[in-house]
Design a protein with these regions (language model features):
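Transmembrane alpha-helix interface/packing and boundary motifs in multi-pass membrane proteins
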Residues: 46-55, 132-141, 182-193, 283-289, ...
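Juxtamembrane and boundary regions of transmembrane helices in multi-pass small-molecule transporters
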Residues: 1-24, 142-146, 161-264, 413-472
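Lipid-exposed faces of alpha-helical membrane segments in multi-pass integral membrane proteins
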Residues: 12-19, 40-47, 62, 66, ...
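Membrane-interface helix termini and inter-helical loops of multi-pass transporters
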Residues: 26-32, 73-81, 109, 207-216, ...
């Protein structure tokens, strides 16, 4: 029997959880015992998600069990938490994204972009980011997008130009492309409700915490201008900060053409995938007008993929990331919801809002975003960070007088952009960093600069855009 449990990493979450629990007699008068117990369990669970003594799914199940065992919720009500439609949207979209990988359509699209725009290294970077942008609406796992589709293309392309860490030639091309893809992946994740697993969580928490209704369309409309500006500006800044030594890539077109010839003509499965993707995209855009929500759209798309044979039930069962996400996100969202229902989040929001009482709401919101962003150095998952802090921060912003929809969307966008911090910040980070093309020091320093760029574009220009379209 292989024991993969790292028992020492349980020490910190258990100690912190027990200390908070033991402080129950000294809790604020505004909170009841149940709210304080829930807070202790939630904090312990989040810390365990960070220290990772077990996989995050296993940790969440233990937290769920303790929550029910101590009587905070009864079993029936707790199990109903696994029926959250926003989380099922994530799972369904995981399955849809598997179709891009299985059919080879994602790879074909990437190669076509390289063939069309790959004459220069900078153009190559823009073309790869463009592929990420196209795939993002139907790929809620930005890890799958970066690791399953984009990274193999970048690695093969870099090696074909003699750029490998092993030979000390990573600066030729690979380092620039790897880091640009990382940043582009975060930007596209922020642009669509269905482009990163944490976004539907933010949508759900916004509804429960501040009664804000976020749709696929209003998220996209709000994000499109700062998103497109970021996709144009950020690769160019990286090009200037960390320039590749190979700036012309005349052979890229030939390489891509050879790879496409090797793939052969577009298959029937790929044609089905294209058609179903467009059906899903149209329904996500128009769903709020025809009463088809984003989750139902994802179910429709998956049903069509199964009916056409693009995916089979074994594919669904083997998509372990979806089932894992369904379990641990359900538990964390359930816990956050209980904190809200038991009065802890409203109390905390009022407390922080009172302490920031001398400031206007724009200053409060900016301070909250800065805190949200830089506290991510303590997290190894953007989605876990959103699950842990989004509701409380949104509550504080609204209590300070900030427009609810504007605040919910801005915090939602930065729930993605905050991954521009470390090499362990989110799923794509360790995949791309582990390739060896970019050193840890360089990774952190460039992220430090780009964090400021994101503040200027998304808070500055993004706020002006959202005011112009009436979302502020």
């Amino acid at each position: 029997m292989e024991n993969t449990v790292k028992y020492r990493k349980f020490i910190l979450p258990i100690v912190v959880g027990l200390i908070i629990w033991a402080l129950t007699p000294f809790k604020p008068d505004a909170l009841n015992d149940q709210a304080w117990y829930m807070f202790a369990i939630f904090v312990a669970t989040i810390i365990a998600c960070i220290t990772q003594p077990m996989t995050i799914g296993a940790v969440s199940i233990i937290g769920f069990t303790i929550m029910v065992l101590v009587g905070i919720m009864d079993t029936k009500s707790a199990v109903e938490g696994f029926g959250n439609s926003s989380i099922w949207l994530i799972a369904m979209a995981f399955f849809i994204s598997r179709g891009f990988v299985k059919t080879g359509l994602g790879r074909r699209i990437a190669l076509q972009f390289v063939k069309l725009f790959g004459k220069k290294t900078l153009g190559l970077a823009y073309s790869l980011v463009g592929v990420d942008l196209i795939l993002a609406p139907a790929t809620p796992s930005n890890t799958a997008r970066a690791g399953g589709i984009m990274f193999p293309i970048i690695k093969s392309l870099s090696e074909s130009f003699g750029s490998t860490p092993k030979d000390g030639t990573e600066r030729k091309m690979g380092a620039f492309l790897i880091f640009t893809e990382f940043q582009g992946n975060l930007i596209t994740a922020a642009m669509f409700l269905t482009a990163m697993a944490g976004n539907p969580i933010a949508q759900s928490l916004a509804e429960k915490t501040a009664h804000v209704h976020i749709t696929w369309m209003n998220w996209f409309v709000a994000a499109i201008v700062p998103g497109l500006i970021s996709l144009i500006v950020v690769p160019f800044i990286i090009y200037k900060m960390y320039p590749p030594t190979v700036k012309e890539t005349p052979n890229a077109k030939k390489w891509a053409t050879e790879q496409l010839e090797e793939m052969g003509k577009i298959s029937l499965a790929e044609k089905f995938m294209i058609g179903i993707f467009f059906v899903a995209l149209i329904l996500w855009i128009t769903g709020s007008f025809i009463n088809i929500d984003a989750t139902l759209t994802a179910f429709i798309a998956l049903s069509l993929l199964l009916l056409t044979g693009v995916l089979n039930w074994k594919d669904i069962l083997n998509e372990t990331g979806a089932w894992n996400t369904l379990v641990w996100f359900s538990v964390l969202v359930l816990m956050a919801d209980q904190l809200n229902k038991l009065g802890f989040i409203p109390w905390l929001s009022k407390l922080i809002a009172h302490s920031l009482g001398g400031f206007s709401w724009p200053i409060v919101l900016v301070l909250l975003i800065l805190f949200f962003f830089y506290s991510h150095y303590l997290f190894a998952s953007a989605t876990a960070h959103v699950s842990a802090m989004y509701a409380a921060l949104l509550g504080v912003a609204v209590a300070a007088g900030a427009p609810p929809l504007f605040s919910a969307l801005m915090l939602g966008f930065f729930g993605n952009l905050l991954a521009s911090t470390t090499h362990y910040s989110s799923g794509p980070a360790p995949i791309l960093y582990a390739s060896g093309y970019v050193s840890q020091k360089r990774w952190w320093l460039m992220n430090l600069v780009l964090g400021i760029v994101y503040f200027i574009i998304w808070i500055g220009l993004g706020s002006l855009w959202m005011k112009l379209i009436g979302m502020m």
